[in-house]
Amino acid sequence: MSRRHAAEKRVILPDMKYNSILLSRFINNIMKEGKKALAEKIVYSAFNKIEKKHRVDPYQTFNNAMHNVKPHLEVTSVRVGGANYQVPTHVDERRGYTLASRWIINAASKRSEKMMIDKLAEELFEASNNRGVAIKKKEDTHKMAEANKAFSHFSPKKM
């Protein structure tokens, strides 16, 4: 891996329906094997299901879910004197939303409902209400960071 400079961040166009870059990145994370139309159909159908079943604004529910699942701390492995330490570090905005979308998608795919549309709709609704597997993943990450607070002086970057 080259160490000269970091790769440039690609410009991601906002989605057509809600004009949101965050939602567009979420759709890209759902996408498998380049099937973006199918990923969009899954997300927008899940939004329709949220709107019909719970009678709430689906886009606002999505934003609340992403905000609730987004971690503030995580642990990174740092090697010091032949030992690896789990050092708590702050998570920047972009990585936080990336982790949140990954956790929501993984939690949704492991649910017991039959179709991904139903799984995603329920997981987003639960995450927006601070419940569900994705929220538990965030809490576990924060607990791990809190437990390793003693190693924060090994931090590779300033907190």
Swiss-Prot record:
One GO cellular component term noted in the UniProt record for this chain: small ribosomal subunit
Single GO molecular function: structural constituent of ribosome
Alphabetical list of Gene3D superfamilies matching this protein: Ribosomal protein S7 domain (1.10.455.10)
Subunit structure: Part of the 30S ribosomal subunit. Contacts proteins S9 and S11.
Family: Belongs to the universal ribosomal protein uS7 family.
Xref: NCBIfam families: rpsG_bact
Role noted for this protein: One of the primary rRNA binding proteins, it binds directly to 16S rRNA where it nucleates assembly of the head domain of the 30S subunit. Is located at the subunit interface close to the decoding center, probably blocks exit of the E-site tRNA.
Listed name of the protein: Small ribosomal subunit protein uS7
Species of origin: Rickettsia felis (strain ATCC VR-1525 / URRWXCal2) (Rickettsia azadi)
Lineage: Bacteria, Pseudomonadati, Pseudomonadota, Alphaproteobacteria, Rickettsiales
